[in-house]
Amino acid sequence: MAQINPLPVPLGPWKITVYDQENFQGKRMEFTSSCANIMECGFDNIRSLKVECGAWIGYEHTSFCGQQFVLERGEYPRWDAWSGSNAYHIERLMSFRPICSANHIESKLVIFEKENFVGPQWELCDDYPSLQAMGWGNNEVGSMKVQCGAWVCYQYPGYRGYQYILESDHHGGEYKHWREWGSHAQTFQIQSIRRIQQ
């Protein structure tokens, strides 16, 4: 009997509930799509949230700018729950959007030592809490190609420091310069990387 290939898992649905007070108190609002400015919804800031479905990117500023935070399924009772081991004290979350490409079963990322996809390269298909411990000879990455899925890259080993979310459906999956990693990108120092799964 012939084996039928399963259809790809449909993208979405996504659902996130945000609160204007810590510990899921105060005003609340549910979203199933992007929000470029939480102030337009009557909030001055998001102080806690629950991700009920899908993976999301939260941003420090409106219009999807500033420090990025990956928001995966679960509860975030305070700002430090989403910034976690981030080396920077950021209590602000003003915009967010779903990560559409996080739904891929197989994730693949190629990192390059230099900008514009030049120099030694390394193909990743798994999580790496320390690139150097796994054989990458540098603490910097010049450019990256996301061939499938979505990834979060961290400035320091152990998934700490600035977070950069890279997606196969943004920039055509090609990030030829570290400044393309996000509006907050200040360095091409990347020392840990992991896949974003739904």
Curated annotation (Swiss-Prot):
Disulfide bridges in this chain: none
Domain of life of the source: Eukaryota
GO biological-process terms attached to the record: lens development in camera-type eye; visual perception
A molecular-function term among this protein's GO annotations: structural constituent of eye lens
Keyword Repeat set for record: yes
Region (Connecting peptide): 101-106
Residue ranges constituting the Beta/gamma crystallin 'Greek key' domain according to the UniProt record: 14-53, 54-100, 107-148, 149-197
Location of the region described as N-terminal arm in the Swiss-Prot/TrEMBL record: 1-13
Keywords, in A-Z order: Eye lens protein, Repeat
Database matches in InterPro entries: Beta/Gamma-Crystallin (IPR050252), Beta/gamma_crystallin (IPR001064), G_crystallin-like (IPR011024)
Post-translational modification: The N-terminus is blocked.
UniProt note: domains: Has a two-domain beta-structure, folded into four very similar Greek key motifs.
Family: Belongs to the beta/gamma-crystallin family.
Cited PANTHER family: BETA-CRYSTALLIN A3, BETA/GAMMA CRYSTALLIN
Protein task: Crystallins are the dominant structural components of the vertebrate eye lens.
Quaternary data: Homo/heterodimer, or complexes of higher-order. The structure of beta-crystallin oligomers seems to be stabilized through interactions between the N-terminal arms.
Protein name as annotated: Beta-crystallin A1-2
Species name: Aquarana catesbeiana
